[in-house]
Amino acid sequence: LIMRIAKFISNAGYCSRREAEKLINKKKVYINKKLCVAPNINVMENDKITINGNIIKLNKKIRLWKMYKPTNVICTNNDPKKRKTIFEFLPKNMPRAISIGRLDFMSEGLILLTNNGDFARKLELPSSNIIRIYRVYIATVVKSNDIKKINYGVIINGILYKKIEVTIEKMNQKKTSLKFKLREGK
């Protein structure tokens, strides 16, 4: 099995490909005890890859975990603003995990984690055709006309957003509960 070093690191569950490229550019990655000088170098499964002295191995078995993400928590490994991350809630003895997609900082709900970067990417792509369900609570009354517009697609600031399925779950004089079914995160 031959693949680029950045992909190898991502598939091993160490970090994303972009983060792997940054580590390579910072001269933190070694292949068979030789400094890796570019993220496009091909490696084989039996090559010895180290990052900061730690041996990186491919995960043969894809693992999948589910987690409840509370509000005011971010879906990243390192936050420059020092906010809490979902990874701080994981058990200390848990293998390295990658979030599959993200939820906004103020959002709460189910988030999936895996140990395999390729698997995460496949599930994140709109072409995977996986339906994501979001419940949104709005502190106002929503008109059924507005829902129809969203269901048929809308243009916001000159950008056409594809149609999505939105339904009103509950509504009273002060607030509305909406259910969104999306095939992509935008």
Residues covered by each model-derived region:
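Basic, flexible Lys/Arg- and Gly-enriched helix-loop patches that mediate nucleic-acid binding at interfaces
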Residues: 2-186
